[in-house]
Amino acid sequence: MTNLVPVGRALLSVSDKSGLLDLARALAELEVELISTGGTAATLRAAGLKVRDVAEVTGFPEMMDGRVKTLHPMVHGGLLALRDDDEHLVAMAAHGIEPIDLLVVNLYPFEAAVARGASYDDCIENIDIGGPAMIRAAAKNHRFVNVVTDTADYKALLDELRAHDGATTLAFRQKLALTAYSRTAAYDAAVSAWMAGALKSEAPRRRTFAGTLAQTMRYGENPHQKAAFYTDGSHRPGVATAKQWQGKELSYNNINDTDAAFELVAEFDPSEGPACVIVKHANPCGVARGATLAEAYGRAFDCDRVSAFGGIIALNQPLDAATAEKITEIFTEVVIAPGADEEARAIFAAKKNLRLLTTEALPDPLAPGLAFKQVAGGFLVQDRDAGHVDALDLKVVTKRAPSDAELADLLFAWTVAKHVKSNAIVYVKDGATVGVGAGQMSRVDSTRIAARKSQDMAQALGLAQPLTQGSVVASDAFFPFADGLLAAAEAGATAIIQPGGSMRDDEVIAAADEAGLAMVFTGQRHFRH
């Protein structure tokens, strides 16, 4: 095979030392000469391996606290030289440049420094310069050079070398080069994103998003679509950080819905009591607080028992046995919680297809972050919706002010409405949703659909009155006309929370007063598309 290239010399310079010694020993057994830098060389020597310092190769000492060590023609010439170009070979001979056939580099842990909240100066010091330069050089010259940037590829490298008597194929080197360029692109994207945040640059001239492959999937949102899941390095608690205890591999839709459920349940402080969210197609179909987690689940389930079948459940407290027992009474796709006790896990173990995820923590709903949406030819970027209101932010605009009980439910409903696809209408009573209207083009239609579903559920539960009787209503945006408010009143609602800001606010307020409703304005909108 003419594309086989033997490996005779390797340069190793790694921050992550895991697997390093096994790799180096195997390379030594294959009679590969080892060159290394600083701490990597010290680790290899301590293990009894023969290694040349890069300073010996360059004839120049490491300097400036290690900032300058591999940025030298003796290194980059060895990586970039074309082995079949006579001029390159003459230049190498003239300057004593030795070819480097294998580069093993993993970069300074910049992303980890950012994740732990390191200072600005510390983050700057964790930006690798020499590593990316060598990686890009080796990847560019992959016709002749192997470049390994991920410890997960050590085994594949050794398997390749052993299969070809110490050489590698072009196809293998191309695969490594792709991984290498992906790594340097992601690294630069992480630095750029961090600096944009640190310098409070709202709209940098260029924006790059990067991720690390976590999972390939059988298909995407639909069976004809290919899909994969990538983590972004932010370590925000959720699906990306969760431990899966049991069940089948998560699907594209599972991940999308589970994220929606967990972000909503995180809005409810666990120190203020248990809360449960049930989601279907990224929309909540039941949300409730309770004296116990099991009660919270039961109340959320009673909002829409039909839609809850095959849904996603998110809890704001660790799963306990009593709640686990209730959940197993119907088919559920995924349960996500900060934790799960041993007895609860044992109960779930009997349901092999039920996926259980634990995260150890809840995401901070007020934390800054970015959200983006792809459009033809570009993408939209905005701050994550971290909007929040409390009782002091509300403006009473009707003759009647809400009671304390109504006020508590209004704030609960407003929190839920933030996570419902627009146009969103949410009915709440006693700390539980009793009707959710989502995704309608007309706000009055969302109001009526939520009320009708509530009536259907009341009949199924054998109740004489609809669940919305005596409830409060949240609307994610203003009522453009009074019709939506009147539909809510007709369904039995007694109080309304909405942003306000319509040119017909006066008409809507007058209609609320005539119906005896209390209404408050938040001054904040929560469109969700």
UniProtKB/Swiss-Prot annotation:
One Gene Ontology term from the biological process aspect of the record: 'de novo' IMP biosynthetic process
Reactions performed catalytically: (6R)-10-formyltetrahydrofolate + 5-amino-1-(5-phospho-beta-D-ribosyl)imidazole-4-carboxamide = 5-formamido-1-(5-phospho-D-ribosyl)imidazole-4-carboxamide + (6S)-5,6,7,8-tetrahydrofolate; IMP + H2O = 5-formamido-1-(5-phospho-D-ribosyl)imidazole-4-carboxamide
Pathway noted in the entry: Purine metabolism; IMP biosynthesis via de novo pathway; 5-formamido-1-(5-phospho-D-ribosyl)imidazole-4-carboxamide from 5-amino-1-(5-phospho-D-ribosyl)imidazole-4-carboxamide (10-formyl THF route): step 1/1; Purine metabolism; IMP biosynthesis via de novo pathway; IMP from 5-formamido-1-(5-phospho-D-ribosyl)imidazole-4-carboxamide: step 1/1
Keywords: Hydrolase, Multifunctional enzyme, Purine biosynthesis, Transferase
EC number(s) per entry: 2.1.2.3, 3.5.4.10
Name of the protein: Bifunctional purine biosynthesis protein PurH
Annotated GO MF terms: IMP cyclohydrolase activity; phosphoribosylaminoimidazolecarboxamide formyltransferase activity
Record-linked InterPro entries: AICAR_Tfase_dup_dom_sf, Cytidine_deaminase-like, MGS-like_dom, MGS-like_dom_sf, PurH-like
Residue stretches making up the MGS-like domain: 2-149
UniProt domain comment: The IMP cyclohydrolase activity resides in the N-terminal region.
GO cellular component, one term: cytosol
Pfam families assigned to the protein according to its UniProt record, in alphabetical order: AICARFT_IMPCHas, MGS
CDD domains hit by this protein: IMPCH
Coiled coil, from the record: none
Gene3D superfamilies in the cross-refs: 3.40.140.20, Methylglyoxal synthase-like domain
Source taxon at top rank: Bacteria
First and last residue of the signal peptide: none
Protein family membership: Belongs to the PurH family.
